[in-house]
């Protein structure tokens, strides 16, 4: 059985026991999280939401809070001695899926 959930403005296909990286959640390591926006449940009994499946949820455990690799942006204007260098590290949350309630 698998499900498609929406969190952080993105859609993720999840299965029980799988680990996913999502946009940062306000939870500590070891906390339980519940995703209520389930738009599809697949398996023996397929359910499609309009826009979400009624009564469906996905439960998981927060494994890690972290930051991705640095992305560097560099802008310059030729012949003007002007340049700008900026870095950004996007925060993420690693979640292990425990149960899919359909």
UniProtKB/Swiss-Prot annotation:
Which GO molecular function, any one, fits this protein according to its record? structural constituent of ribosome
The Gene Ontology biological process annotation of the record reads: translation
| Signal peptide region | none
Q: Where is the composition biased (Polar residues)?
A: 93-102
Instruction: Give disulfide pairs as residue numbers.
Output: none
Work out whether the entry's keyword set contains Ribonucleoprotein: yes
Q: Where is the composition biased (Basic residues)?
A: 77-88
Q: Which domain of life is it from?
A: Bacteria
Nucleotide-binding keyword on record: no
Question: What PROSITE patterns does this protein map onto?
Answer: RIBOSOMAL_L21
The record's SUPFAM superfamilies line, in alphabetical order, gives:
L21p-like (SSF141091)
State the residue spans of region: Disordered: 77-102
What would be one Gene Ontology cellular-component term for the protein? ribonucleoprotein complex
Query: Sorted alphabetically, which keywords does the UniProt record give?
Result: Ribonucleoprotein, Ribosomal protein, RNA-binding, rRNA-binding
Family of the protein in this entry: Belongs to the bacterial ribosomal protein bL21 family.
Q: What does this protein do?
A: This protein binds to 23S rRNA in the presence of protein L20.
Q: Which HAMAP family match?
A: Ribosomal_bL21
The name on file for this protein is: Large ribosomal subunit protein bL21
Q: What organism does the UniProt record list as the source?
A: Limosilactobacillus reuteri (strain DSM 20016) (Lactobacillus reuteri)
């Amino acid at each position: 059985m698998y499900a498609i959930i929406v969190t952080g403005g993105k859609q993720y296909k999840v299965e029980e026991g799988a680990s996913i990286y999502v946009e940062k959640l306000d939870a500590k390591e070891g906390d339980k999280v519940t995703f209520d926006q389930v738009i599809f449940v697949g398996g023996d009994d397929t359910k499609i939401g309009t826009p979400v499946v009624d009564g469906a949820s996905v439960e998981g455990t927060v494994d890690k809070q972290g930051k991705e690799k640095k992305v560097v942006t560099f802008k310059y204007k030729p012949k003007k001695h002007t340049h700008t260098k900026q870095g950004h590290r996007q925060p993420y949350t690693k979640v292990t899926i425990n149960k899919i309630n359909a």
